[in-house]
Regions:
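Extended, low-hydrophobicity, polar/charged segments
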Residues: 1-154
Length: 154
C-alpha cells in the first residue's frame, strides 16, 4: 500500500472500506478535511473540520471547556516523525490524540482524508468515518468560508 504502515493498520483494524487516489493540493491542504492540533494543561487535542470552513478557536474552547492553543510546528514535526508520516493525517485516531470532530463532517456522505503521505488521499463514506471516530466529541466550531465572504460583501 502506498501509505504509511500506521494508516494501513488503523484502517484494517476497523475493517474500513476505502479508496486511495493521488493527492491534489487545494489551498495548501489535501482532501476535504482539515486538522489542527491544540494543547493545554490537559494534553493535546486533534480537531477535524471541513476544508470549506474556518475553525473558530473561541467556539472550540467553549465547546471543550478548555483553554487551547495551537501546538508548535516542531511538535507537529515530532508527531509526524514518530508515526513515519510526511505530514499530519486527517484519518481519525491515527495520531493517538483526543479527538473532536466538527458536525459538518458528519453531515457529508463521502470524505477525502489526508493519508499523511505526500502523494495519496483516502476516500471513505460517512458510515466508515463514523466508525473511525468512535466516541469522539462532536460539535459545531467552524464557520463556512462562503458565509464570511457573503457577510463581508453586504
Amino acid at each position: 500500500m502506498p501509505v504509511a504502515a500506521i494508516i494501513e493498520e488503523r484502517l484494517s483494524q476497523q475493517n474500513s472500506v476505502f479508496g486511495i487516489s493521488e493527492a491534489v493540493a487545494s489551498d495548501g491542504h489535501f482532501g476535504d478535511v482539515k486538522t489542527t492540533i491544540f494543547q493545554d494543561q490537559h494534553g493535546k487535542l486533534q480537531a477535524l473540520y471541513s476544508g470549506d470552513s474556518i475553525l473558530d478557536v473561541e467556539a472550540l474552547c467553549r465547546l471543550t471547556q478548555r483553554q487551547l492553543s495551537v501546538v508548535s510546528p516542531a511538535a507537529i514535526g515530532s508527531i509526524c516523525d514518530q508515526l513515519t508520516l510526511e505530514r499530519l493525517t486527517t484519518i481519525p485516531t491515527v495520531l493517538g490524540l483526543e479527538l473532536i470532530v466538527d458536525q459538518r463532517l458528519l453531515d457529508t456522505t463521502e470524505l477525502t482524508l489526508d493519508s499523511g503521505s505526500k502523494h495519496y488521499v483516502i476516500t471513505i463514506n460517512n458510515e466508515q468515518f463514523r466508525n473511525l471516530i468512535g466516541d469522539a466529541q462532536t460539535g459545531t466550531y467552524t464557520v463556512l468560508e462562503s458565509e464570511l465572504v457573503t457577510s463581508s460583501l453586504e
